[in-house]
């Protein structure tokens, strides 16, 4: 195979695995996605929503994790069939150009710039946890150290390193979080499924809705993570293994085989991040809501630590801090890895660089790998309100999801398809789309009606 996974030719062709066990060997993009998803504010946003709403809004978390998967699959399928990244596909969406770039490309660029605040909040949360573990270093020092470590791990741009480190981190925080939820049944905060079902509400207050919509934008596959998934599918080799499109029966069979591998990858990832995200919410609802404690900026980490210390005991505080570090740092790590691909691709579509040139791409990835973490660090050191920063980024992500939905519809009905999708696939896609649009519009209306943002 070529050293550049973005170049597709006859020499890159590989037949897809047929057995389930063999398919497992080709999973990977979903691991990186899970590291980004579970870390990207779930510890903060999801637990805070649980603390505010109790079990009433649990349905939003489940909906958020499940609803966006079909859109993610449509993006992954399009990438495998066309070899295009999400940004390259956005450049072919209908609509006007602004300068050299399509409106959709500019929209992603603006959204990512606004989301600098969100990731800055996550990086800041990581620094706060490290300061609690090692107080001899200030939060300022840990913020800069975290930025430097993230950059040093990513700047060479090796996919295999990113995948392996992502898998390690999600394993650690998954075990810790699920263990904490399990042992909750031996405490006064135990609950049953009847508590969840009987307390579910669909008419939420404006304040809770603002947090819920922010959480909906962050939890599950967020808009920027759907975009990022296309790069990981390419760098894992799925598109290159299919080979150049030629419409032969052999090509179609090979394409369907690798699409099936991608489907399995996405389902495994969904199972992982849904389980952990739901656990965070339930811990927040069972422990913090019951105690009447909602995380705030002054006692954010101390309050969040209760979800572990109240189930695993006071001795687990260190375990929470270590687990919290991996949860938040995994998001910084995976987001940086993704954005180092997306930003150079955007620059290429705007005519500033050439993403197709592997040497130029590697240089830009290296530069962006160092610029972004320190930009995130600067936003945190300037604002110093990680909770608001994380939730505000979720709001931006919810808006960007509207464009992602439009792109998914364009891929499905206007761009290349291997064959006409079945009724089940189309039904799932439309449920996904309606859920995203419905919750997004509902949230905007409720927020402006109550004029309560946080």
Task: List each model region and its residues.
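Membrane-interface "cap" regions at the ends of multi-pass membrane proteins
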Residues: 1-42, 102, 214, 238-243, ...
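Flexible loop linkers connecting adjacent transmembrane helices
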Residues: 6-11, 46-48, 73-99, 130, ...
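Juxtamembrane transmembrane-helix boundary signature
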Residues: 33, 60-95, 107-114, 334
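Extracellular/periplasmic helix-exit of transmembrane alpha-helices
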Residues: 70-81, 233-234, 240-241, 271-302
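Loop-to-transmembrane helix boundary motifs in multi-pass membrane proteins
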Residues: 100, 139-145, 315, 347-382
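Hydrophobic transmembrane alpha-helices that form the core helical bundles
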Residues: 101-134, 328-348, 392, 437
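C-terminal membrane-solvent junction of multi-pass transporters and transport-like membrane proteins
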Residues: 168, 351, 355-367, 391-444
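Hydrophobic alpha-helical segments and their helix-loop junctions in multi-pass secondary transporters
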Residues: 171-207, 212-231, 405-417, 439-451
């Amino acid at each position: 195979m070529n050293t550049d996974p973005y170049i597709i030719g006859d020499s890159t062709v590989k037949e897809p695995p047929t057995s389930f066990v063999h398919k497992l060997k080709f999973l990977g993009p979903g691991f990186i996605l899970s590291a980004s998803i579970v870390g990207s504010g779930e510890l903060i946003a999801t637990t805070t929503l649980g603390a505010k709403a109790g079990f009433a809004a649990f349905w939003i978390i489940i909906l958020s994790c499940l609803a966006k998967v079909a859109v993610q699959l449509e993006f992954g399928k399009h990438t495998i069939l066309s070899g295009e990244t999400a940004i390259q596909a956005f450049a072919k969406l209908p609509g006007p150009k602004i300068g050299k770039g399509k409106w959709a490309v500019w929209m992603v660029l603006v959204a990512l710039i606004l989301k600098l605040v969100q990731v800055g909040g996550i990086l800041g949360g990581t620094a706060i946890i490290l300061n609690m573990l090692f107080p001899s270093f200030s939060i300022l020092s840990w913020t800069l150290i975290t930025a430097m470590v993230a950059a040093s791990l990513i700047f060479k741009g090796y996919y295999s390193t990113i995948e392996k480190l992502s898998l390690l981190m999600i394993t650690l925080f998954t075990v810790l979080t699920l263990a904490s939820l399990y042992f909750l049944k031996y405490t006064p905060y135990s609950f049953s499924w009847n508590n969840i079902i009987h307390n579910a509400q669909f008419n939420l207050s404006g304040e809770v809705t603002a947090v819920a919509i922010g959480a909906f934008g962050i939890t599950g596959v967020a808009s920027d993570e759907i975009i990022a998934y296309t790069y990981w599918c390419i760098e894992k080799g799925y598109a290159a293994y299919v080979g150049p499109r030629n419409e032969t029966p052999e090509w179609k069979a090979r394409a369907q085989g690798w699409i099936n591998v991608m489907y399995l990858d996405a389902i495994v990832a969904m199972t992982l991040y849904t389980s952990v995200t739901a656990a965070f919410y339930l811990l927040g609802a069972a422990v913090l809501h019951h105690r009447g404690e909602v995380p705030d900026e002054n006692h954010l980490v101390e309050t969040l630590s209760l979800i572990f210390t109240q189930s695993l005991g006071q001795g687990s505080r260190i375990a929470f801090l270590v687990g919290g570090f991996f949860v938040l740092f995994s998001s910084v790590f995976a987001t940086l890895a993704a954005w180092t691909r997306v930003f150079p691709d955007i620059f290429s579509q705007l005519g500033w660089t050439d993403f197709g040139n592997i040497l130029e791409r590697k240089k830009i990835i290296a530069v962006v790998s160092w610029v972004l973490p320190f930009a995130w660090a600067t936003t945190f050191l300037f604002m110093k309100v990680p909770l608001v920063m994380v939730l505000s980024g979720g709001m931006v992500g919810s808006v960007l999801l509207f464009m992602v939905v439009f792109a998914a519809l364009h891929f499905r009905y206007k761009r290349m398809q291997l064959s006409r999708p079945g009724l089940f696939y189309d039904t799932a896609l439309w449920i996904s789309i309606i859920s995203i649009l419905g919750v997004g519009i509902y949230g905007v209306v409720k927020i402006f009606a109550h004029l309560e943002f946080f």
